[in-house]
């Protein structure tokens, strides 16, 4: 489908512009087609979060601006756009401005290799999973730069907490992704999804039982909890612990500079949820191989599964208390990393037996 659209556009534009213009324009069109809906989802995820948490606390949530509060994200965006960006006198101006940029860029760049269907991706590269692991690890630099450049004790302490926490849980997440790589035999995101559509259960129509979440259940749980820590979401949000260090590395930011951190956090939350769906929950594959389910387009299945995972993120925030910082470090280093290493060996040994279900 993407190739057909490209060929059609090339035929229409070929006689108007030089041959080198259309490929560049096509890349820009694909980038906008991915990022524009993403920004809309990020905006309305904030509304859904406030509504969902309001429901758990027997409140209505935002309901003043627009019908049922549907225009609240637009009002929030306008408010942040019109606020002044204040740079502290003692701050390092260059680093202070670079921090939010370095934080949001990896959160957006990782979407380049996320497939929305069998042939629908901004860039369908063979090392897609490796690209995501590499690009998302750069976000910690933005947090450190923001904390250092602010020249504030609270910001610096929050940045140190964030960097230690993100690096710690990246190791466990990396081992989880290595296990998925072993069973799928590919770093290509599309191949990883398609490999989950085969097996004994899938041959009987129960595709959801052949997805990676079932045979790799401990890895799935570790990945999900590590995703909470990696995105600094509750109960791992000691980075911006309101009762201790106000807002962590973001304490000196205002206006759109603060909004960029905000956008990065929610874009990352959607990203790790989509990755969870692609790696463990069958991506765009329907849960049951029957006409009742397969007529629904794959991108809708992907969206529905992602919505469920994101909602679980919000449920965790409204349910569990915040961990102490030492508890977070202990969980990452003494529990998750050993568990993932053990399962790495178990899955490797399992694949060498006659009972290998991933052949």
From Swiss-Prot:
One Gene Ontology CC term in the entry: plasma membrane
Main location: membrane
UniProt key word Cell membrane: yes
Transmembrane spans: 16-36, 94-114, 128-148, 167-187, 205-225, 261-281, 296-316, 331-351
Keywords: Cell inner membrane, Cell membrane, Membrane, NAD, Quinone, Translocase, Transmembrane, Transmembrane helix, Ubiquinone
Enzyme class: translocase
Gene Ontology BP terms: aerobic respiration
Organism domain of life: Bacteria
Membrane topology: Multi-pass membrane protein
Entry's family note: Belongs to the complex I subunit 1 family.
HAMAP family according to UniProt: NDH1_NuoH
Full protein name: NADH-quinone oxidoreductase subunit H
Organism lineage: Bacteria, Pseudomonadati, Pseudomonadota, Betaproteobacteria, Burkholderiales
Gene designation per UniProt: nuoH
């Amino acid at each position: 489908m993407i190739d057909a659209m490209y060929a059609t556009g090339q035929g229409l534009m070929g006689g108007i512009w030089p041959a080198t213009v259309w490929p560049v324009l096509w890349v820009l069109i694909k980038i906008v087609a991915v990022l524009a809906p993403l920004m809309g989802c990020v905006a309305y995820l904030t509304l859904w979060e406030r509504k969902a948490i309001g429901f758990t606390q027997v409140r209505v949530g935002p309901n003043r601006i627009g019908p049922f509060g549907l225009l609240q994200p637009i009002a929030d965006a306008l408010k942040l756009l019109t606020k002044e960006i204040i740079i502290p006198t003692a701050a390092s101006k260059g680093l202070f401005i670079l921090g939010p940029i370095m934080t949001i860029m990896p959160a957006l760049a990782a979407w380049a290799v996320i497939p929305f269907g069998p042939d629908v991706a901004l860039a369908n590269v063979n090392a897609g999973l490796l690209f995501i692991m590499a690009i998302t690890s750069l976000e910690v630099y933005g947090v450190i730069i923001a904390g250092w450049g602010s020249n504030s004790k609270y910001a610096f302490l929050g940045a140190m907490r964030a960097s230690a926490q993100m690096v710690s849980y990246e190791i466990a997440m990396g081992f989880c992704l290595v296990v998925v790589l072993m069973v799928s035999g590919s770093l290509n995101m599309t191949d990883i999804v398609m490999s989950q559509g085969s097996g004994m259960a899938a041959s009987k129509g129960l595709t959801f039982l052949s997805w990676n979440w079932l045979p790799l259940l401990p890895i799935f749980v570790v990945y999900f909890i590590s995703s909470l820590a990696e995105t600094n979401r509750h109960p791992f949000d000691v980075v911006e612990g309101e009762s201790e260090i106000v807002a962590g590395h973001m304490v000196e930011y205002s206006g759109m500079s603060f909004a960029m951190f905000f956008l990065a956090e929610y874009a990352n939350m959607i990203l790790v949820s989509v990755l969870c769906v692609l790696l463990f929950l069958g991506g765009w594959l329907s849960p049951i191989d029957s006409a009742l389910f397969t007529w629904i387009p794959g991108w809708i299945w992907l969206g529905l599964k992602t919505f469920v995972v994101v909602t679980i993120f919000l449920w965790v925030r409204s349910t569990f208390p915040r961990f102490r910082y030492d508890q977070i470090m202990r969980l990452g280093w003494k529990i998750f990393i050993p568990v993932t290493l053990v399962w790495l060996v178990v899955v490797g040994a399992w694949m060498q037996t006659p009972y290998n279900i991933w052949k």
